[in-house]
Swiss-Prot record:
Residues 1-61 form a transit peptide. It catalyses: 7-phospho-2-dehydro-3-deoxy-D-arabino-heptonate = 3-dehydroquinate + phosphate. NCBIfam families: aroB. This is 3-dehydroquinate synthase, chloroplastic. Induction: Up-regulated by elicitor. It is an enzyme of class 4 (lyase). Pathway: Metabolic intermediate biosynthesis; chorismate biosynthesis; chorismate from D-erythrose 4-phosphate and phosphoenolpyruvate: step 2/7. It comes from Solanum lycopersicum. The gene is DHQS. PANTHER family: 3-DEHYDROQUINATE SYNTHASE (PTHR43622), 3-DEHYDROQUINATE SYNTHASE, CHLOROPLASTIC (PTHR43622:SF7). The keyword Transit peptide applies. GO terms for cellular component: chloroplast. Transmembrane segments: none annotated. Highly expressed in roots. Lower expression in stems, flowers and cotyledons. Barely detected in leaves. GO terms for biological process: amino acid biosynthetic process; aromatic amino acid family biosynthetic process; chorismate biosynthetic process.
Amino acid sequence: MASSFCPKQALSFTNSTHQLHQSRAIPRDIHVRFPAPVSSPSSRCGLKSKATTRLKVLATSATKVMDHSSSKASSQAPTVVEVDLGTRSYPIYIGAGLLDQPDLLQRHIHGKRVLVVTNTTVAPLYLDKTISALTDGNPNVTVESVILPDGEQFKNMETLMKVFDKAIESRLDRRCTFVALGGGVIGDMCGYAAASYLRGVNFIQIPTTVMAQVDSSVGGKTGINHPLGKNMIGAFYQPQCVLIDTDTLNTLPDRELASGLAEVIKYGLIRDAEFFEWQEQNMPLLLARDPTAFTYAIKRSCENKADVVSQDEKESGVRATLNLGHTFGHAVETGVGYGQWLHGEAVAAGTVMAVDMSRRLGWIDDSLVQRVQKILQQAKLPTSPPETMTVEMFKSIMAVDKKVADGKLRLILLKGSLGNCVFTGDYDQKALDETLRAFSKS
Protein backbone atom coordinates (compact mmCIF):
# COMPACT_ATOMS: atom_id res chain seq x y z
CA MET A 1 0.00 0.00 0.00
CA ALA A 2 2.98 2.30 -0.45
CA SER A 3 2.16 5.60 -2.03
CA SER A 4 2.88 6.70 -5.57
CA PHE A 5 2.03 10.23 -4.41
CA CYS A 6 4.62 12.50 -5.99
CA PRO A 7 5.60 15.89 -4.62
CA LYS A 8 5.93 17.28 -8.11
CA GLN A 9 2.54 16.08 -9.27
CA ALA A 10 -0.62 16.62 -7.25
CA LEU A 11 -1.57 19.90 -5.65
CA SER A 12 0.01 18.31 -2.82
CA PHE A 13 4.70 18.33 -0.86
CA THR A 14 8.00 21.96 3.15
CA ASN A 15 6.82 25.02 4.00
CA SER A 16 7.35 26.17 0.41
CA THR A 17 4.83 28.71 1.42
CA HIS A 18 3.14 31.53 -0.40
CA GLN A 19 3.62 32.08 -4.05
CA LEU A 20 1.14 34.22 -5.83
CA HIS A 21 -1.00 31.96 -7.97
CA GLN A 22 1.70 33.07 -9.41
CA SER A 23 9.83 15.66 30.85
CA ARG A 24 6.80 15.06 32.82
CA ALA A 25 5.37 11.56 33.03
CA ILE A 26 2.31 10.91 30.88
CA PRO A 27 -0.25 8.42 32.18
CA ARG A 28 0.04 5.13 30.35
CA ASP A 29 -3.50 5.02 29.00
CA ILE A 30 -5.67 8.09 28.55
CA HIS A 31 -9.12 7.65 27.02
CA VAL A 32 -10.64 10.80 25.64
CA ARG A 33 -14.16 11.50 24.45
CA PHE A 34 -15.01 14.90 23.06
CA PRO A 35 -18.52 15.32 21.72
CA ALA A 36 -20.04 18.10 19.62
CA PRO A 37 -19.36 21.81 19.40
CA VAL A 38 -16.50 23.44 21.21
CA SER A 39 -18.34 26.72 21.32
CA SER A 40 -21.14 25.28 23.44
CA PRO A 41 -19.46 23.96 26.60
CA SER A 42 -22.76 23.05 28.21
CA SER A 43 -23.33 20.41 25.54
CA ARG A 44 -19.94 18.79 26.03
CA CYS A 45 -20.01 15.82 28.42
CA GLY A 46 -16.59 14.36 27.72
CA LEU A 47 -14.51 16.99 29.52
CA LYS A 48 -14.52 18.32 33.04
CA SER A 49 -16.93 21.24 33.19
CA LYS A 50 -14.32 23.44 34.83
CA ALA A 51 -12.00 22.90 31.90
CA THR A 52 -14.57 23.48 29.21
CA THR A 53 -15.70 26.76 30.67
CA ARG A 54 -12.17 28.08 30.24
CA LEU A 55 -12.65 28.50 26.52
CA LYS A 56 -13.83 32.02 25.79
CA VAL A 57 -15.19 32.96 22.41
CA LEU A 58 -15.25 36.73 22.53
CA ALA A 59 -16.87 37.60 19.22
CA THR A 60 -19.38 36.27 16.78
CA SER A 61 -18.36 33.23 14.79
CA ALA A 62 -18.59 32.81 11.05
CA THR A 63 -21.83 31.37 9.73
CA LYS A 64 -21.94 27.67 10.44
CA VAL A 65 -23.83 26.40 7.39
CA MET A 66 -22.10 27.04 4.08
CA ASP A 67 -24.82 26.19 1.53
CA HIS A 68 -24.87 29.71 0.11
CA SER A 69 -22.35 31.18 -2.29
CA SER A 70 -19.25 32.84 -0.88
CA SER A 71 -19.18 36.53 -0.11
CA LYS A 72 -16.21 38.82 -0.41
CA ALA A 73 -14.47 39.29 2.91
CA SER A 74 -13.51 42.77 4.06
CA SER A 75 -11.75 44.33 7.02
CA GLN A 76 -13.91 44.24 10.10
CA ALA A 77 -13.74 43.52 13.81
CA PRO A 78 -12.04 40.16 14.26
CA THR A 79 -13.40 37.04 15.84
CA VAL A 80 -11.40 36.43 19.02
CA VAL A 81 -10.69 33.08 20.66
CA GLU A 82 -8.78 33.21 23.93
CA VAL A 83 -6.26 30.66 25.11
CA ASP A 84 -6.83 30.59 28.86
CA LEU A 85 -3.54 30.08 30.71
CA GLY A 86 -4.11 32.30 33.71
CA THR A 87 -1.70 35.22 33.73
CA ARG A 88 -0.24 34.03 30.42
CA SER A 89 -3.56 33.94 28.54
CA TYR A 90 -3.60 35.45 25.07
CA PRO A 91 -6.03 36.18 22.23
CA ILE A 92 -6.22 34.65 18.77
CA TYR A 93 -7.55 37.27 16.35
CA ILE A 94 -9.22 35.82 13.25
CA GLY A 95 -10.51 37.74 10.25
CA ALA A 96 -9.86 39.38 6.90
CA GLY A 97 -7.75 42.52 6.61
CA LEU A 98 -6.33 42.32 10.14
CA LEU A 99 -2.90 43.52 9.01
CA ASP A 100 -4.69 46.74 8.09
CA GLN A 101 -5.71 47.24 11.73
CA PRO A 102 -2.49 48.41 13.45
CA ASP A 103 -3.96 48.54 16.95
CA LEU A 104 -4.33 44.76 17.07
CA LEU A 105 -0.56 44.28 16.89
CA GLN A 106 0.57 47.43 18.64
CA ARG A 107 -1.28 46.67 21.86
CA HIS A 108 0.95 43.59 22.28
CA ILE A 109 4.35 45.19 21.60
CA HIS A 110 6.73 45.46 24.54
CA GLY A 111 9.27 48.25 24.41
CA LYS A 112 10.25 50.11 21.25
CA ARG A 113 12.23 47.51 19.33
CA VAL A 114 10.75 44.80 17.11
CA LEU A 115 12.38 41.99 15.13
CA VAL A 116 10.26 40.44 12.38
CA VAL A 117 11.36 36.92 11.44
CA THR A 118 10.12 35.81 8.02
CA ASN A 119 11.30 33.94 4.92
CA THR A 120 12.22 34.59 1.31
CA THR A 121 8.74 33.68 0.06
CA VAL A 122 6.58 35.59 2.53
CA ALA A 123 8.75 38.71 2.84
CA PRO A 124 7.96 40.16 -0.62
CA LEU A 125 4.25 39.65 0.02
CA TYR A 126 3.66 40.76 3.61
CA LEU A 127 6.78 42.20 5.27
CA ASP A 128 6.12 45.84 4.32
CA LYS A 129 2.47 45.55 5.34
CA THR A 130 3.50 44.06 8.69
CA ILE A 131 6.06 46.78 9.34
CA SER A 132 3.40 49.40 8.57
CA ALA A 133 1.00 47.73 11.00
CA LEU A 134 3.68 47.80 13.70
CA THR A 135 4.68 51.43 13.18
CA ASP A 136 1.59 53.27 11.87
CA GLY A 137 0.91 56.16 14.24
CA ASN A 138 3.63 54.79 16.49
CA PRO A 139 6.89 56.51 15.39
CA ASN A 140 8.76 55.49 18.53
CA VAL A 141 8.82 51.85 17.41
CA THR A 142 11.70 50.71 15.20
CA VAL A 143 11.53 47.45 13.28
CA GLU A 144 14.34 45.18 12.17
CA SER A 145 13.82 42.09 10.04
CA VAL A 146 15.62 38.87 9.27
CA ILE A 147 14.68 36.92 6.15
CA LEU A 148 15.41 33.20 6.33
CA PRO A 149 15.44 30.58 3.57
CA ASP A 150 12.07 28.89 3.07
CA GLY A 151 11.52 25.22 3.84
CA GLU A 152 11.44 22.50 6.50
CA GLN A 153 15.00 21.56 5.55
CA PHE A 154 16.13 24.88 7.03
CA LYS A 155 14.44 24.36 10.39
CA ASN A 156 17.75 23.73 12.12
CA MET A 157 20.35 25.24 14.42
CA GLU A 158 22.32 26.86 11.61
CA THR A 159 19.30 28.84 10.42
CA LEU A 160 18.23 29.65 13.98
CA MET A 161 21.61 31.29 14.57
CA LYS A 162 20.77 33.86 11.88
CA VAL A 163 17.94 35.11 14.10
CA PHE A 164 20.26 35.41 17.11
CA ASP A 165 22.91 37.10 14.96
CA LYS A 166 20.44 39.76 13.84
CA ALA A 167 19.10 40.32 17.36
CA ILE A 168 22.57 40.72 18.85
CA GLU A 169 23.88 42.88 16.00
CA SER A 170 20.82 45.12 16.44
CA ARG A 171 21.46 45.27 20.19
CA LEU A 172 17.92 44.28 21.06
CA ASP A 173 17.25 44.25 24.78
CA ARG A 174 14.83 42.30 26.96
CA ARG A 175 11.98 44.69 26.19
CA CYS A 176 12.02 43.87 22.49
CA THR A 177 9.35 41.89 20.65
CA PHE A 178 9.95 39.09 18.15
CA VAL A 179 7.27 38.70 15.45
CA ALA A 180 6.91 35.46 13.48
CA LEU A 181 5.60 36.19 9.98
CA GLY A 182 5.15 32.99 8.00
CA GLY A 183 4.16 29.37 8.26
CA GLY A 184 4.87 26.71 10.83
CA VAL A 185 8.63 26.61 10.30
CA ILE A 186 9.00 30.35 10.86
CA GLY A 187 6.65 30.28 13.86
CA ASP A 188 8.49 27.40 15.50
CA MET A 189 11.94 28.92 14.97
CA CYS A 190 10.99 32.48 15.90
CA GLY A 191 9.23 31.21 19.03
CA TYR A 192 12.24 29.17 20.06
CA ALA A 193 14.52 32.14 19.42
CA ALA A 194 12.25 34.33 21.58
CA ALA A 195 12.27 31.73 24.35
CA SER A 196 16.07 31.60 24.29
CA TYR A 197 17.23 35.14 23.52
CA LEU A 198 18.21 36.87 26.77
CA ARG A 199 16.34 33.98 28.45
CA GLY A 200 13.01 35.07 27.02
CA VAL A 201 11.53 38.05 25.17
CA ASN A 202 8.07 39.03 23.97
CA PHE A 203 6.73 37.07 20.99
CA ILE A 204 3.84 37.50 18.50
CA GLN A 205 2.61 35.02 15.88
CA ILE A 206 1.32 36.12 12.46
CA PRO A 207 0.72 32.77 10.72
CA THR A 208 0.29 32.91 6.94
CA THR A 209 -0.47 29.26 6.08
CA VAL A 210 -3.47 27.10 6.90
CA MET A 211 -1.21 24.72 8.83
CA ALA A 212 0.10 27.50 11.04
CA GLN A 213 -3.26 29.23 11.45
CA VAL A 214 -5.17 26.15 12.62
CA ASP A 215 -2.43 24.43 14.60
CA SER A 216 1.22 25.34 15.02
CA SER A 217 0.81 29.03 15.94
CA VAL A 218 -1.46 28.17 18.88
CA GLY A 219 -0.25 26.53 22.06
CA GLY A 220 3.37 27.55 22.50
CA LYS A 221 5.24 24.64 20.95
CA THR A 222 8.48 25.99 19.48
CA GLY A 223 11.64 24.36 18.25
CA ILE A 224 13.85 23.01 15.51
CA ASN A 225 14.56 19.65 13.92
CA HIS A 226 17.52 17.33 14.47
CA PRO A 227 18.82 15.00 11.74
CA LEU A 228 17.61 12.06 13.84
CA GLY A 229 14.14 13.37 14.59
CA LYS A 230 11.62 16.15 13.99
CA ASN A 231 11.11 18.83 16.67
CA MET A 232 13.53 17.13 19.04
CA ILE A 233 14.96 20.46 20.27
CA GLY A 234 12.61 23.15 21.55
CA ALA A 235 10.57 24.70 24.33
CA PHE A 236 7.03 25.51 25.36
CA TYR A 237 6.79 29.28 25.01
CA GLN A 238 3.50 31.11 24.58
CA PRO A 239 3.04 34.16 22.34
CA GLN A 240 1.44 37.42 23.43
CA CYS A 241 -1.12 37.05 20.67
CA VAL A 242 -1.82 35.23 17.42
CA LEU A 243 -3.04 37.38 14.53
CA ILE A 244 -4.65 35.37 11.71
CA ASP A 245 -5.31 37.55 8.68
CA THR A 246 -7.24 35.22 6.40
CA ASP A 247 -6.36 37.40 3.40
CA THR A 248 -2.88 35.84 3.50
CA LEU A 249 -4.43 32.59 2.25
CA ASN A 250 -5.08 34.28 -1.10
CA THR A 251 -1.41 33.81 -2.01
CA LEU A 252 -1.04 30.29 -0.63
CA PRO A 253 -0.31 27.55 -3.19
CA ASP A 254 -2.91 24.79 -3.48
CA ARG A 255 -0.51 22.20 -2.17
CA GLU A 256 0.15 24.20 1.01
CA LEU A 257 -3.56 24.79 1.49
CA ALA A 258 -4.29 21.06 1.25
CA SER A 259 -1.48 20.31 3.70
CA GLY A 260 -3.11 22.49 6.35
CA LEU A 261 -6.44 20.73 5.92
CA ALA A 262 -4.88 17.57 7.41
CA GLU A 263 -4.84 19.28 10.82
CA VAL A 264 -8.40 20.56 10.37
CA ILE A 265 -9.56 16.99 9.66
CA LYS A 266 -7.67 15.77 12.73
CA TYR A 267 -9.73 17.87 15.13
CA GLY A 268 -12.93 16.32 13.86
CA LEU A 269 -11.61 12.78 14.19
CA ILE A 270 -10.27 13.02 17.73
CA ARG A 271 -12.75 15.29 19.48
CA ASP A 272 -15.35 17.08 17.36
CA ALA A 273 -17.59 14.75 15.34
CA GLU A 274 -19.92 17.55 14.30
CA PHE A 275 -16.99 19.49 12.84
CA PHE A 276 -15.87 16.40 10.88
CA GLU A 277 -19.35 16.00 9.44
CA TRP A 278 -19.35 19.68 8.48
CA GLN A 279 -16.03 19.15 6.66
CA GLU A 280 -17.46 16.20 4.73
CA GLN A 281 -20.19 18.52 3.43
CA ASN A 282 -18.01 21.58 2.85
CA MET A 283 -14.62 20.32 1.62
CA PRO A 284 -15.27 21.67 -1.92
CA LEU A 285 -15.80 25.16 -0.45
CA LEU A 286 -12.57 24.91 1.54
CA LEU A 287 -10.61 23.87 -1.54
CA ALA A 288 -12.23 26.77 -3.41
CA ARG A 289 -11.04 29.13 -0.64
CA ASP A 290 -14.54 30.28 0.24
CA PRO A 291 -13.82 33.02 2.81
CA THR A 292 -16.81 32.28 5.03
CA ALA A 293 -16.12 28.56 5.09
CA PHE A 294 -12.44 29.06 5.78
CA THR A 295 -13.00 31.57 8.56
CA TYR A 296 -15.33 29.09 10.23
CA ALA A 297 -12.88 26.19 9.83
CA ILE A 298 -10.03 28.25 11.29
CA LYS A 299 -12.14 29.47 14.18
CA ARG A 300 -13.45 26.01 15.03
CA SER A 301 -9.95 24.53 14.84
CA CYS A 302 -8.54 27.25 17.09
CA GLU A 303 -11.36 26.69 19.59
CA ASN A 304 -10.47 23.01 19.75
CA LYS A 305 -6.76 23.69 20.11
CA ALA A 306 -7.28 26.43 22.72
CA ASP A 307 -9.57 24.20 24.76
CA VAL A 308 -6.97 21.43 24.92
CA VAL A 309 -4.02 23.74 25.60
CA SER A 310 -5.89 25.47 28.43
CA GLN A 311 -6.15 22.09 30.17
CA ASP A 312 -2.75 20.62 29.35
CA GLU A 313 -0.22 23.22 28.25
CA LYS A 314 2.86 21.00 28.32
CA GLU A 315 1.42 17.80 26.88
CA SER A 316 1.36 15.78 30.09
CA GLY A 317 -1.91 14.13 29.09
CA VAL A 318 -4.82 15.16 26.89
CA ARG A 319 -2.76 17.44 24.62
CA ALA A 320 -0.95 14.38 23.28
CA THR A 321 -4.17 13.42 21.48
CA LEU A 322 -3.57 16.32 19.08
CA ASN A 323 -0.80 14.16 17.61
CA LEU A 324 -3.09 11.76 15.75
CA GLY A 325 -1.12 10.54 12.74
CA HIS A 326 1.97 12.48 13.77
CA THR A 327 4.05 9.53 15.01
CA PHE A 328 3.85 7.78 11.65
CA GLY A 329 3.90 11.15 9.87
CA HIS A 330 7.06 12.42 11.56
CA ALA A 331 8.74 9.15 10.61
CA VAL A 332 7.84 9.84 6.98
CA GLU A 333 9.19 13.41 7.12
CA THR A 334 12.44 12.24 8.69
CA GLY A 335 12.76 9.15 6.52
CA VAL A 336 12.35 10.83 3.13
CA GLY A 337 14.27 13.94 4.17
CA TYR A 338 12.92 17.19 5.59
CA GLY A 339 11.18 19.20 2.92
CA GLN A 340 10.30 16.37 0.55
CA TRP A 341 6.80 15.89 1.97
CA LEU A 342 4.93 18.75 3.61
CA HIS A 343 3.99 18.22 7.25
CA GLY A 344 0.29 17.89 6.49
CA GLU A 345 0.92 15.42 3.71
CA ALA A 346 2.91 13.21 6.07
CA VAL A 347 0.28 13.59 8.81
CA ALA A 348 -2.45 12.58 6.35
CA ALA A 349 -0.63 9.36 5.46
CA GLY A 350 0.11 8.80 9.16
CA THR A 351 -3.55 9.32 10.03
CA VAL A 352 -4.57 6.58 7.60
CA MET A 353 -2.02 4.27 9.24
CA ALA A 354 -3.30 5.10 12.74
CA VAL A 355 -6.87 4.49 11.61
CA ASP A 356 -5.85 1.19 10.00
CA MET A 357 -4.22 0.08 13.25
CA SER A 358 -7.31 1.12 15.22
CA ARG A 359 -9.41 -1.10 12.96
CA ARG A 360 -7.02 -4.04 13.34
CA LEU A 361 -7.38 -3.71 17.11
CA GLY A 362 -11.16 -3.88 16.71
CA TRP A 363 -11.62 -0.39 18.13
CA ILE A 364 -13.43 1.16 15.14
CA ASP A 365 -15.52 -0.21 12.30
CA ASP A 366 -14.77 -0.26 8.58
CA SER A 367 -17.17 2.57 7.81
CA LEU A 368 -15.03 5.07 9.72
CA VAL A 369 -11.91 3.85 7.92
CA GLN A 370 -13.64 4.51 4.62
CA ARG A 371 -14.79 7.99 5.69
CA VAL A 372 -11.25 8.95 6.65
CA GLN A 373 -9.88 7.72 3.33
CA LYS A 374 -12.57 9.60 1.43
CA ILE A 375 -12.18 12.97 3.13
CA LEU A 376 -8.39 12.92 2.78
CA GLN A 377 -8.74 12.10 -0.90
CA GLN A 378 -11.26 14.94 -1.25
CA ALA A 379 -8.69 17.25 0.34
CA LYS A 380 -6.10 16.10 -2.23
CA LEU A 381 -3.90 14.54 0.43
CA PRO A 382 -1.97 11.25 0.29
CA THR A 383 -3.47 8.19 1.96
CA SER A 384 -0.31 6.08 2.22
CA PRO A 385 3.38 6.75 2.84
CA PRO A 386 6.00 6.98 0.08
CA GLU A 387 7.25 3.75 -1.46
CA THR A 388 10.75 4.36 -0.12
CA MET A 389 9.65 3.89 3.50
CA THR A 390 10.41 0.46 4.95
CA VAL A 391 9.20 -1.26 8.11
CA GLU A 392 12.65 -0.90 9.62
CA MET A 393 12.78 2.82 8.83
CA PHE A 394 9.46 3.36 10.57
CA LYS A 395 10.54 1.38 13.63
CA SER A 396 13.96 3.00 14.02
CA ILE A 397 12.65 6.56 13.63
CA MET A 398 9.60 6.03 15.85
CA ALA A 399 11.87 4.57 18.56
CA VAL A 400 13.05 8.12 19.33
CA ASP A 401 9.57 9.67 19.16
CA LYS A 402 8.84 12.11 22.00
CA LYS A 403 5.91 9.98 23.16
CA VAL A 404 8.06 6.92 23.92
CA ALA A 405 8.06 6.15 27.66
CA ASP A 406 10.01 3.35 29.34
CA GLY A 407 10.84 1.94 25.93
CA LYS A 408 7.17 1.71 24.89
CA LEU A 409 5.85 3.61 21.89
CA ARG A 410 2.57 5.28 22.78
CA LEU A 411 0.18 6.15 20.00
CA ILE A 412 -2.98 8.16 19.45
CA LEU A 413 -5.61 5.82 18.04
CA LEU A 414 -9.32 6.10 17.37
CA LYS A 415 -11.60 4.08 19.62
CA GLY A 416 -15.39 3.92 19.50
CA SER A 417 -17.55 6.30 17.51
CA LEU A 418 -16.35 9.30 15.52
CA GLY A 419 -14.79 11.96 17.77
CA ASN A 420 -13.30 9.53 20.31
CA CYS A 421 -9.65 8.62 20.68
CA VAL A 422 -7.18 7.04 23.07
CA PHE A 423 -3.55 7.86 23.86
CA THR A 424 -1.98 4.61 24.94
CA GLY A 425 0.92 2.20 24.93
CA ASP A 426 -1.39 -0.64 25.88
CA TYR A 427 -2.07 -2.29 22.54
CA ASP A 428 -1.31 -5.55 20.77
CA GLN A 429 2.09 -5.16 19.09
CA LYS A 430 0.86 -7.48 16.37
CA ALA A 431 -1.56 -4.81 15.14
CA LEU A 432 1.25 -2.26 14.81
CA ASP A 433 3.44 -4.75 12.95
CA GLU A 434 0.60 -5.63 10.59
CA THR A 435 -0.07 -1.97 9.83
CA LEU A 436 3.59 -1.28 9.13
CA ARG A 437 3.81 -4.27 6.79
CA ALA A 438 0.61 -3.22 5.01
CA PHE A 439 1.90 0.28 4.28
CA SER A 440 5.65 -0.22 3.77
CA LYS A 441 8.21 -2.64 2.43
CA SER A 442 9.78 -5.25 4.71
